[in-house]
Swiss-Prot record:
The gene is tat. Keywords: Acetylation, Activator, AIDS, Apoptosis, Host cytoplasm, Host nucleus, Host-virus interaction, Inhibition of host innate immune response by virus, Inhibition of host interferon signaling pathway by virus, Interferon antiviral system evasion, Isopeptide bond, Metal-binding, Methylation, Modulation of host chromatin by virus, Modulation of host PP1 activity by virus, Phosphoprotein, RNA-binding, Secreted, Transcription, Transcription regulation, Ubl conjugation, Viral immunoevasion, Zinc. The keyword Membrane does not apply. Residues 38-48 are annotated as: Core. Interacts with host CCNT1. Associates with the P-TEFb complex composed at least of Tat, P-TEFb (CDK9 and CCNT1), TAR RNA, RNA Pol II. Recruits the HATs CREBBP, TAF1/TFIID, EP300, PCAF and GCN5L2. Interacts with host KAT5/Tip60; this interaction targets the latter to degradation. Interacts with the host deacetylase SIRT1. Interacts with host capping enzyme RNGTT; this interaction stimulates RNGTT. Binds to host KDR, and to the host integrins ITGAV/ITGB3 and ITGA5/ITGB1. Interacts with host KPNB1/importin beta-1 without previous binding to KPNA1/importin alpha-1. Interacts with EIF2AK2. This is Protein Tat. GO terms for cellular component: extracellular region; host cell cytoplasm; host cell nucleolus.
Amino acid sequence: MEPVDPNIEPWNQPGSQPKTACNQCYCKKCCYHCQLCFLQKGLGICYGREKRRQRTTTPYASKNHKDPIPKQPLPQARGDPTGPKESKKEVESKTKTDP
């Protein structure tokens, strides 16, 4: 494509830029407004500086992560230490009453 006027830069040639300015509308007509609009709006390609995104946390999600581990009951020794003594007493009392 030959420039119309060789003394003018290619980006200033007639027809190289649209007559209307770019806008924030995403309709079909505005997406095909110019090459820049097509890349950004139509294809979603933007070569600009990316902004940092802040994490959005919900109170429900943060609550789940902060729950402490449920406490487990303390391990108990097998058999009750007072159990065998009582059972012996019960056996002795039963044997005494039975004869």
